[in-house]
């Protein structure tokens, strides 16, 4: 692949080098007309940003390069688009724009000077037009991640200069044309993630193919034999072939240039796995995940150039052999989701001298003490095992260690004092004791600290204020005795704070009782089942970021998503949602929740709750709140789950709650509410238990009928109505994101949180990432 990359990079460099800064007026006008055909994201509305991807020839002034930033264009790409008037284009990249399920236009065939055409992730539908054959100068054609259908086109018939062809992640069907393997210069071919079937023929070994990906198709017959004739292959992916016969690993011995082999999701013959077979000695990356292997493969011992090995999701049991740590170049090793119980060799030295930097041994049955980790370790995941004893202090000497996940084990003793050295620390669900070390140094890089479900005592360490990058802090289900950590609002990036089931106590409002809580970025605050007391000021929620969250405020889709090389980590947390308390993973970045339940809070629910426009879940149950349910709840338009049960609330339920279209769960039981239950569709569908324990309530879903069915709501006096209007006016002034919040509600309504139980392991996306 390196030669191919160099050639393509050289082409782009040449195109830019021969370009002038100025284009002919008619070309500039054509580009502007093309721009005006689409809706734009804010980053692309500026002409300077848009034209930064336009390059013109220094002699003719014609546009030769058009490379638009991903996500700028949104709309239909029509056959008469101004784009197709740019007949001198040599390089066109429109990837990652949204063309709204447009068909791939035959007008692309008019751009017959194109050498590079990149149309990845555009939403194109239908078949590839035959006019693509007119682009005889193409060296690279990328059409992946679209919705293209039909048989694989014979478009390559005239494209004799192609170096790279990527048709992956589409809906192509039928067989692979043999002409794909006779192209004189084709070095890269990716047909993965389609619906291809049947077999294909390769007449000779003259093909220049070095990179071939046929994974995740529906081949029903043998396709490996013809592939073995491609003797120049360096990269080969045959994952999830769905063939009826197991694969014999020894058949790959003719491919001596092979450095990368992906067979995950296939069945392998037992003899080839457990024998000293002849295997390509230049192998660097070998992916055998989910291959039904039950013993550690012996042939791996001879692969001295191997640097990435994936044996995850197999049935391997017993001890990890000590020779695996002696492979001189091994950097990434994934043994997760097997049945390993231990390690051969001394725990002090067996791993310590290894070159491994990324190690995943999660979801196994390891027991006993934890071995000293490799000296160069960067990412270490050992969650969901049965390790016991102390966490080895040697982790503090691993200066490269970035991610440490030892959660769901049986570790005892204290937390090592070096947690501020790491980006991710997850020690959840162990038996750790003592205080959380107060040794987070200035400039600590910690982003996630999860020590929930242990036996920790003392106070929250004030040195956490040095962790300016921290996003996720969870100390739930411990024995921490402290006041409400209002001082944490000085952390500029804190998004999730979980204090559930400890001995936190005292008031939650600031000392002057006037200021708002004002965490700058907090989205999830879970402080239930503590001993908090006092009341909340009216403006308590006035300055929270939850009021204006947008769906794509960040690049990450999931909260706490951390990726490094081949390692993926996502934060998980326990939340009560729609009446269920479960562990939640894959939390979308715009998800927001507040849980104050099970405390001793009193007074009225602050009217400022109505400012939290994008709040999705709110639980204030089992406190001593009094007064009316604020009518400002009607402004929390994204609310899906509301629990106010077990308080002393009085008056009527605001009829406006019946118009909250996403409210799928409401519980106001065991209060002192009166009057008619709102009759919105969402509320009528609730069980009657959600309204029981209020002697004055009537109407569906309760059996008590109301005497005056048409009586309007009169719970709020005129002065309070004026106050609510003031809150609504304040909400308008609190940010332009309010209207956009209504739009993302449609996505929120479809979003189902990733509920799962930890022991189910396979749903938790942690471990070494497939290339």
Swiss-Prot record:
Membrane-crossing residue ranges in chain numbering: 730-750
Per-repeat ranges for LRR: 86-110, 112-135, 136-159, 160-183, 185-206, 207-230, 232-254, 255-281, 283-303, 304-327, 329-350, 353-377, 378-397, 398-419, 420-443, 445-467, 469-491, 492-516, 519-543, 588-612, 613-636, 637-660, 662-685
SMART domains linked to this entry: LRR_TYP
Keyword Glycoprotein set for record: yes
Stretches of the chain found on the membrane's Cytoplasmic side: 751-771
Annotated signal sequence range: 1-20
Compartments where located: Cell membrane
GO cellular component: plasma membrane
Bilayer disposition of the protein: Single-pass type I membrane protein
Sequence similarity: Belongs to the RLP family.
Name of protein: Receptor like protein 22
Gene: RLP22
